[in-house]
Structures are given as C-alpha cells and as structure tokens.
Amino acid sequence: MKILITNGRVLDPAHGIDEKFDVLIEDNRIAQVGTDIQTADAEKIDAAGCLVVPGLIDIHVHLRDPGFEYKEDIESGTRAAAAGGFTAVACMPNTSPVNDNKATTQYILHKAAQAGHAKVYPVGAITKGLKGESLAELGDMKQAGCVAVTDDGHPVSHGEIMRRALEYARSFDLPIVSHSEDLSLVGDGVMNDGFVATELGLRGIPWVAEVSAVARDVMLAEYTNARLHVAHVSTRGAVEIIRAAKARGARVTAETAPHYFTLTEDAVRGYDTHAKMNPPLRTSDDLEAIREGLADGTLSVIATDHAPHHPDEKNVEFNLALNGIIGLETALPLTLRLVEEGALSLSDAIACLTSGPAAALSLPGGTLEVGRPADVTIIDPEIKWTLDPQAGQSRSRNTPFGDWKLKGRAICTIVDGRITYRLSD
C-alpha cells in the first residue's frame, strides 16, 4: 500500500527538518521525503495547513490489561492513543498479574498485535510483584520484548535493591524508569502540602518527598553508570537535580506530564477528584520550573501517565478517590498551548512527543528518516474544539479538562503505513 502526503509542513526535530515537503509511504516504510513527489497508485492525503510529524510516542501509559479491563484494555487504550495522534505507547506493569515475567509480556504483545491501533511496548517490573523485595527476571523480560523496567505506582524504597537493579539492568542496556517518591514523607497525604491543602482540610504531600527520592536515584544511576529515566517530574527541586546531573554527564533522562505544566494545586479546590493524581499537582512556581525544564532540555519527554479509572473510583470523597487521570487524547493540544504561550518552540514541543521519548527508551520511532517504519501523525494546529469526556475513545472518563476549549488536534494517525485513525471516522 502506498500513501502520498502532500502540501504539509514536515517537522522532524531529530533531523532538523522544518520544510514544506511531500512524504511518500510504501511497503510500511518512509520511502521518500521531498518536493513534488510523483507516484502512481497511491492514496493521497492533502495536508495543506497541517503539520506532518513523526508518529507521537507516549512512554508512560496504564493500559490496565491484564486484570483491570473494566477501566481500560489494550484495544480501547490503543484506540484512544491513535485518536490522540500516538502511534506507539509504552505500558506500565502494575496490572494483575504484574508484568514481571516473560509470559505476561508475551500476552501484552499478542493482544496489541490483534488490536492494531498503535504499537505497544511493554515495560516490565523491577521487582517481583512490585513488592520491592527481590529483582524480577529482567533479562527474560527484555528478551520477550520489554523496553524498560519500573515499579511505577510504587517506589523501590530500599536503596540497595535499587542499586542492584541499576547494575543488573545496565548489563542488558535496559533503562530503569524511576517512580521517585519517599513514602515515609508522603504518609497519608492526598494533595500538595501547602496553603491550599490547609484551606481544604486535606493532608499534604511535601515537595521533598519527590525531590529526595529523585536525588537518591540520580546518584545511584551515576554510581552504577546505568540508564535512569525519571517519571512524572512535578517539582522545581527535581528539575534542578536532573539538570545538574545531566550537566555532569549522568545517563539520566526525565519526563513530565501535561497536567504538571497546565494545572496547579488550585484545581483541587471544590474537592475535584479529577485533579487528584500522584505526584500531586503542585504550585505555580513548580509549574514554571517544569516549563523551564522542557525549554532547556532538562525534561526531554512529555508523557501522559494515562491512568483510567471507573467512575465509581472517582465519584467518592477526595480522600478515598484513586489517583490518576486519562490523557492520551488531550496531551497534544495541551502541549501546543505551550507553543502558543511562547513557553516552548514548536520544534521542541514535537521533539518532546517524538524523538525525546524514542531516545529515552531506545525505541525505533521518532523520526521520518527514509527507510524507517512509516509511523506518521498529521496535525491540524489551528482546529478549535471542546473536550467532551463522554466522546473519548478510552473506556474511562476521568479527566480534569472536560469542557476545555482546545486548539490543535491529530487528524490522521498512520502506523506502519496503515491509517489507524482519521478525525472524520
């Protein structure tokens, strides 16, 4: 099958390309990128006024499958991904059973191949059962198809176990994704510690719970010379630690999520459980630090931490509500808001959704280089729309952005040369 995309603004940050080019896809690969491409028997897509970029990649997604399919499954989650412009996602291992073994990894890959909406890269567990006690079989999981390991949802609290995990993972060149959190400091907190928490009568989570854990994990990564990717950064202190570590040459990358550069703890006012996540929404100063970190490359990845929940798990009092929000269909327009507000260049914004995540986990996408897999996202940056949570592709509806007026949207998603989403579909 051939697809010829014409008249679009081709933006490939990995190769410094920002030109009005055509893109020819043939035999599931990028066959040609250039001007006035001529070919017969190709499906033509006129991308006038649109951006043509490498397929977006989200390296922090909870697909809830196996075990929690009432919230999301691989089919619905990848459908939501495609609708958001993502051609690939990396799924977290906190499922039931936990993805701490070869068999569960193979199950995920098999089901993802059947769904076909987006590529799925499994992330295995660092420790067996996510219990933080003994290391999982990292080598077996990598051989089965895992691209990284994490105990996401739980920190690896024991420093020696984290050290051994980094050393073991280094032998396979496998990135460790760190959920950096000191549970002894978190206690029974449910939102950011500060004035708003006091005003609402809710127990707070201090910023130092994240920052101290990031500091430990970064130092362990330097000590072991292992690859570390810091997940869902939400605080100024964490940004500063990561910036300094990268300047020293540490093998550290880091991500943040759209809610951390869009919302602050003020969103919790009214006890809105859709504004409850872990780590919690922070202060306006933290938000500015996150934006600065994206602009200077300290944070090279924007990932959603897409965390679907059933309404019964959110429509309860704030203290009892589960943490997390969905984000696959809102990440792109929220990122484009940063561009419109002058906080991030368009090229850097697209890089944080493409080449940045690909580099962090050594994934094959993130570029429109000739010969590479034909994973392409076409974006209309000017389209205006209002988010209706009930109209989303995810099985869950837990978003704090309901009824927000957004600008910019994926209008076509192409995975391995197959169109998996059109806005008109």
From Swiss-Prot:
Binding site for substrate: 62-64, 94, 278, 309
Cofactor notes: Binds 2 Zn(2+) ions per subunit.
GO annotations of cellular component type: cytoplasm
Binding site for Zn(2+) 2: 152, 179, 232
UniProt keywords, alphabetically: Hydrolase, Metal-binding, Pyrimidine biosynthesis, Zinc
Origin superkingdom: Bacteria
Pathway: Pyrimidine metabolism; UMP biosynthesis via de novo pathway; (S)-dihydroorotate from bicarbonate: step 3/3
Cofactor(s) needed: Zn(2+)
Iron listed as a keyword: no
Reaction(s) the record says it catalyses: (S)-dihydroorotate + H2O = N-carbamoyl-L-aspartate + H(+)
Residues annotated for Zn(2+) 1 binding in this entry: 60, 62, 152, 305
InterPro entries: Amidohydro-rel, DHOase, DHOase/Allantoinase_Hydrolase, Dihydroorotase_CS, Metal-dep_hydrolase_composite, Metal_Hydrolase
Catalytic machinery residues: 305
Keyword Hydrolase: yes
PANTHER family per UniProt: ALLANTOINASE
Similarity field: Belongs to the metallo-dependent hydrolases superfamily. DHOase family. Class I DHOase subfamily.
NCBIfam families assigned: pyrC_multi (TIGR00857)
Function as written in the Swiss-Prot or TrEMBL entry: Catalyzes the reversible cyclization of carbamoyl aspartate to dihydroorotate.
HAMAP family: PyrC_classI_B
Protein name: Dihydroorotase
Origin species: Syntrophotalea carbinolica (strain DSM 2380 / NBRC 103641 / GraBd1)
Lineage, broadest ranks: Bacteria, Pseudomonadati, Thermodesulfobacteriota, Desulfuromonadia, Desulfuromonadales
GN (gene name): pyrC
